[in-house]
C-alpha cells in the first residue's frame, strides 16, 4: 500500500511538472492521441524514483530523497515558465545565471504551486511516517521490482509503443534535460534513454570513404564558385558581431502606440550597406547555442544531439580562428556565466581567446552588457579586433511586464505577448543605440565591419515557418555591393559571406551561400545537415 501510494504521488508530481509545457502550446495536438502509452511512460519514470526511495531504509533519508525530487521538479516548473525549457545540466553550479529570474520570480509562481507542494510533501510525510507496517511495504516492494523489470522488457522490446510523447520532454533525469522536443530518445522513456546514451554518449566516429567523398565534392563546388582576392585587399580595423537574442524582423519595423518599437535598429536597417529582414532561422534543439554555432562555424547543429553538450571539444574553422590568422585579437562578451552552455569551451573551439561576462551585475541585463562591450572595444582600440557580444534582455518569457522597460505599450492592434515582447525589444534597442553612439564617438565606426543578426525567432504568436529574423551589415568599412535585400536567406549564409568580406581563401567555406557572390550556391537542407553531421561526428578539423 505504501509503495503504491508513493508511486501515485510521484506520478502526479511529474504530471504537474509537465503541465505548463503543454499549456504553453509547445505540444502538437496530433500527439495527444498517444495519451495512454505516454501515461505509461510517466508511470515508468515515477517508478524509478519510487524504487530509489524504497531501497533506502532510513525514514529521514526517504523523506530527504522525496524532498530533493520535489525541489527539482518545482525548480523546473518555474524555470520552464521563464525560459520555455527545463533546467539544463550545464546550469548546475552556475547559480548566478538564475539572477535573471529575480525580477519575475513572484510573477512566475502560482498559487497552485503551493497547493501541489503542500499536498506532495504532506502525502509523503504521511506515507513514510504514519504507515508503519514494514512487512506490508516490504512485500509490495518485492512484488513491485519484477513489475518494473517487466515494464522495461516490454518497453524496450516494443519501442514503437512510444511513437511520440505526451509531454515530449518527460525523462530529464539522465542528462540533457533541455528543450530537446524533437529528439527521439526522449520519446521512449527513462530506461530507453539511459540505455541509448550508454552507446551514443560519445557520438564521435571514424571518417569513412563516403565522408571523404562528400567533403571533397563540397570543396570542389566551392572552388568553382571562388572569387580571387587581391593580396593587398583592404580589411576592416574591427569586426563587431552583435548576436541579438530573439529579435524578430517584425519588431524592427513595428510601430506601436504611434512610435517605432526599435528606432535605432530600424535606422541601422535603413541606412546599412546591406540589410535583409527575410532571414530564416535554422536553429534546432539548442536554440541560442545553435544560432551561435551556425554563425561561428558555418555548419548546422547536429541532427539529433544537443551540439554544445555532445561536441564541446571539437575543432572547428571558427570565425575566431579565421580572424586570428588575419591578425585580429578575439573576444566575446556574454550576459551569463562562462560555463553556461559550455560557453568557455565553445569559445576555444571557435578560436576566441578572451571571454568576458556581466553576470555579476545581476539584473542589469543589456545595460551592463553594452557597458562591458564598450569597455572591451576601448581596450582593443589600438589593434585589430573581432568582438562578439551576445544580448539577453529579449529572452522569454513574454508573460509579464519587464521591470527595466522604458515604455508601457497599450496598442490594441497587437496581442498581449507582443506588447510584452516589445517592452524588452525597446529596452534592448535603447542600449544598442548607446553602443552605436560610442563607436562613432571613439572613431571605431569609421573602418569597422559591424554585423547585427538574431540568434533565432521566438514568440507564440508566430511559427518557425513564417517567422523571419534580421541580418544587418553596417559600419564604415565599404562593402562590395550595397543593397536592401528582400530575398529569403538563411543563417548558414552569414559565415561564408563574412569569409568573402574578409577576403579569406580557404577550402572550408561552410554549407551556406556568399550573399555578395552571384556564383555562390547554398546546399539543399538535406545536404547541409549531412555535411554538418560529418563535420561534428568525425571531428573533421581535428589535427
Regions found by a protein language model. Give the residues of each.
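Transmembrane and membrane-interface helices of multi-pass
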Residues: 1-191, 195
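Active-site-proximal alpha/beta segments of enzymes that process anionic O-linked groups
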Residues: 146-241, 246-415, 423, 511-515
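Short, flexible loop/turn motifs enriched in small residues
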Residues: 233-235, 464-468
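Feature representing long, continuous alpha-helical segments
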Residues: 263, 321, 371, 375, ...
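Membrane-interface soluble catalytic domains
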Residues: 316, 338-341, 478-543
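Active-site-proximal segments of metal-dependent phosphoesterases and phosphodiesterases across multiple
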Residues: 415-431
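Metal-dependent active-site segment of extracytoplasmic phospho-/sulfohydrolases and closely related
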Residues: 427-466, 495-502
Amino acid at each position: 500500500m505504501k509503495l503504491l501510494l508513493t508511486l501515485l504521488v510521484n506520478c502526479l508530481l511529474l504530471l504537474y511538472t509537465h503541465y505548463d509545457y503543454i499549456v504553453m502550446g509547445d505540444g502538437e495536438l496530433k500527439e495527444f492521441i498517444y495519451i495512454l502509452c505516454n501515461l505509461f511512460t510517466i508511470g515508468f519514470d515515477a517508478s524509478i524514483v519510487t524504487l530509489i526511495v524504497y531501497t533506502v531504509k532510513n525514514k529521514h533519508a526517504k523523506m530527504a530523497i522525496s524532498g530533493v525530487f520535489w525541489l527539482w521538479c518545482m525548480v523546473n516548473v518555474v524555470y520552464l515558465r521563464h525560459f520555455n525549457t527545463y533546467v539544463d545540466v550545464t546550469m548546475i553550479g552556475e547559480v548566478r545565471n538564475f539572477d535573471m529570474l529575480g525580477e519575475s520570480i513572484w510573477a512566475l509562481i502560482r498559487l497552485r504551486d503551493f497547493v501541489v507542494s503542500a499536498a506532495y510533501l504532506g502525502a509523503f510525510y504521511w506515507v513514510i511516517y504514519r504507515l508503519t507496517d514494514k512487512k506490508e511495504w516490504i512485500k509490495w516492494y518485492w512484488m513491485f521490482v519484477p513489475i518494473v523489470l517487466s515494464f522495461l522488457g516490454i518497453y524496450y522490446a516494443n519501442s514503437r509503443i512510444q511513437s511520440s510523447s505526451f509531454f515530449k520532454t518527460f525523462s530529464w533525469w539522465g542528462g540533457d534535460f533541455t528543450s530537446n522536443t524533437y529528439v527521439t530518445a526522449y520519446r521512449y522513456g527513462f530506461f530507453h534513454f539511459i540505455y541509448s546514451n550508454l552507446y551514443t554518449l560519445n557520438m564521435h566516429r571514424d571518417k569513412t570513404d563516403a565522408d571523404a567523398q562528400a567533403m571533397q565534392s563540397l570543396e570542389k563546388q566551392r572552388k568553382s564558385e571562388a572569387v580571387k582576392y587581391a593580396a593587398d585587399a583592404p580589411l576592416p580595423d574591427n569586426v563587431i558581431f552583435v548576436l541579438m537574442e530573439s529579435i524578430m524582423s517584425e519588431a524592427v519595423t513595428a510601430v506601436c502606440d504611434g512610435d517605432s518599437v526599435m528606432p535605432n535598429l530600424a535606422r541601422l536597417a535603413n541606412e546599412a550597406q546591406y540589410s535583409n529582414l527575410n532571414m530564416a532561422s535554422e536553429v534546432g534543439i539548442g536554440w541560442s547555442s545553435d544560432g551561435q554555432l551556425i554563425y561561428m562555424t558555418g555548419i548546422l547543429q547536429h541532427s539529433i544531439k544537443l551540439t554544445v553538450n555532445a561536441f564541446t571539444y571539437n575543432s572547428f574553422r571558427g570565425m575566431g580562428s579565421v580572424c586570428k590568422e588575419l591578425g585580429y585579437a578575439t573576444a566575446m562578451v556574454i550576459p551569463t556565466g562562462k560555463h553556461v552552455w559550455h560557453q568557455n569551451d565553445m569559445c576555444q573551439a571557435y578560436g576566441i581567446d578572451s571571454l568576458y561576462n556581466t553576470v555579476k551585475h545581476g539584473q542589469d541585463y543589456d545595460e551592463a552588457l553594452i557597458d562591458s562591450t564598450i569597455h572591451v572595444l576601448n581596450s582593443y582600440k589600438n589593434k585589430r579586433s573581432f568582438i562578439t557580444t551576445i544580448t539577453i534582455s529579449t529572452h522569454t518569457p513574454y508573460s509579464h511586464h519587464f521591470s527595466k522597460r522604458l515604455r508601457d505599450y497599450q496598442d490594441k492592434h497587437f496581442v498581449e505577448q507582443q506588447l510584452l515582447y516589445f517592452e524588452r525589444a525597446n529596452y534592448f534597442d535603447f542600449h544598442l543605440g548607446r553602443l552605436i553612439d560610442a563607436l562613432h564617438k571613439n572613431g571605431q565606426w569609421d573602418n569597422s565591419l559591424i554585423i547585427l543578426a538574431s540568434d533565432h525567432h521566438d514568440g507564440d504568436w508566430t511559427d518557425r515557418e513564417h517567422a523571419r529574423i534580421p541580418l544587418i551589415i553596417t559600419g564604415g568599412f565599404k562593402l562590395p555591393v550595397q543593397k536592401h535585400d528582400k530575398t529569403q536567406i538563411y543563417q548558414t549564409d552569414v559565415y561564408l559571406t563574412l569569409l568573402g568580406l574578409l577576403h579569406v581563401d580557404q577550402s572550408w567555406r561552410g554549407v551556406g551561400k556568399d550573399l555578395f557572390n552571384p556564383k555562390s550556391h547554398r546546399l539543399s537542407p538535406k545536404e547541409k545537415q549531412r555535411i554538418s553531421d560529418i563535420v561534428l561526428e568525425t571531428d573533421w578539423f581535428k589535427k
